[in-house]
Design a protein with these regions (language model features):
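Receiver (REC) domain active-site loop signature in two-component systems and cognate sites
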Residues: 57
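C-terminal output helix
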Residues: 106-119, 123
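Acidic catalytic/metal-coordinating carboxylates
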Residues: 33-36, 61-65
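Active-site T/S-Asp motif of two-component receiver
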Residues: 53-54
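As written
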Residues: 62, 93-102
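Charged docking surfaces used in two-component/phosphorelay signaling
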Residues: 15-23
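Acidic, metal-coordinating helix/loop segments flanking the phosphotransfer/catalytic sites
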Residues: 30-50, 89
C-alpha cells in the first residue's frame, strides 16, 4: 500500500484529498504546512511513495518543501497543487523534481487520477 504525505494549510482540502486517495487504498499522513511536512519526512526517513503538497502555505511553501524533499530524498515522487496561475508558473522550473502540478479546484476523480499517474511514473 503506497504511503502518501499530504501538505496543505487548508483543513478542508487536506481532509478531502486524504479521503479521496484513501479510496484507492493509500496510507496517508497529513501536515498543515511545509515545515511540518519536512519534519514528518525526516522523522519517517523519507519512507513515503509520494509527497502531495500545496504550493502556497505559511511557514514553508510547497516549492521550498519540494526542493528540500528532492535534495534529502531523491527517490520521492512529488506532486504539487495550486489554485493560482502565478504559482503554477513558479513551479514550471521544477520539472526535474516535480511530476506534475494539479490545478485547484479539482474533483475527487481528478486528484485520484493525478496520484495514480504520479505513483505509476518512473522517477527521473
Amino acid at each position: 500500500m503506497p504511503r502518501i504525505l499530504i501538505a496543505d494549510d487548508e483543513d478542508s482540502m487536506r481532509m478531502l484529498v486524504a479521503r479521496a486517495i484513501a479510496m484507492d487504498g493509500h496510507d496517508t499522513m497529513t501536515a498543515a504546512d511545509g515545515a511540518e511536512a519536512l519534519d514528518l519526512l525526516t522523522r519517517e526517513q523519507g519512507r513515503f511513495d509520494l509527497l502531495l503538497t500545496d504550493i502556497q502555505m505559511p511557514v514553508m511553501d510547497g516549492i521550498a518543501l519540494a526542493l528540500a524533499a528532492a535534495r534529502d530524498f531523491p527517490d520521492l515522487k512529488i506532486l504539487l497543487m495550486t489554485g493560482y496561475a502565478d504559482q503554477r508558473e513558479r513551479a514550471s522550473g521544477l520539472n526535474a523534481i516535480v511530476h506534475d502540478v494539479v490545478t485547484k479546484p479539482f474533483t475527487v476523480a481528478d486528484i485520484r487520477t493525478a496520484v495514480a499517474d504520479a505513483l505509476a511514473a518512473r522517477k527521473g
